[in-house]
Amino acid sequence: MIEDIKKDAQDRMGKCVEATKAQMAKVRTGRAHPSLLDTIQVNYYGSMTPLKQVGNVTIEDSRTLAVNVFDRSAIQAVEKAIMSSDLGLNPMSAGATIRIPLPPLTEERRRDLVKVVRAEAEQGRVAIRNVRRDANSSFKQLEKEKECTEDDVRRSEEEVQKITDLHIKKIDELLAAKEAELMEV
């Protein structure tokens, strides 16, 4: 029973790290990356469709993305969706390809993005601590129900704390890497 709780806590903490990593990936850095456009939805024949289902996003060079639209009639809709996104991008179409030059980030914008990334990391840490709290309360519940001893509970809480520290360290590493990437000129 205790092992199940620990395994569940470890799995949930791993998911917290992955979710934090995904949130950090959405933050725009100075470099072109296809995942930058993952959140964009295109009004395609009356329904909102993810951009990657309407076209193929590739990296043209370090500061330019290219979107090869599958259906030429959707080019204007794709351009409009990119322009109306909060990414501050200005697409230029050339035939069935839309080029998106990424403007360099200003120092002020970089600092703002670092704040955003730090907030995402803190949310990840809080989520991991909540998982730890849930696991610890489950251990205490088992002790109340006389299914395990106080020593088992204390030992299990220490093991869950080690798992927690490991996952928080992973988030801190993600944060440090993202901050370095953002502040790189």
From Swiss-Prot:
Chief localization: cytoplasm
One MF term in the entry's GO annotations: ribosomal large subunit binding
Pfam families: RRF
CC annotations in GO: cytosol
Source organism, top-level taxon: Bacteria
Transmembrane segments: none
Keywords of the record: Cytoplasm, Protein biosynthesis
Similarity-based family: Belongs to the RRF family.
NCBIfam families per the UniProt record, alphabetical: frr
Biological role: Responsible for the release of ribosomes from messenger RNA at the termination of protein biosynthesis. May increase the efficiency of translation by recycling ribosomes from one round of translation to another.
Family matches, as HAMAP family: RRF (MF_00040)
Designated name of the protein: Ribosome-recycling factor
Gene that specifies this protein: frr
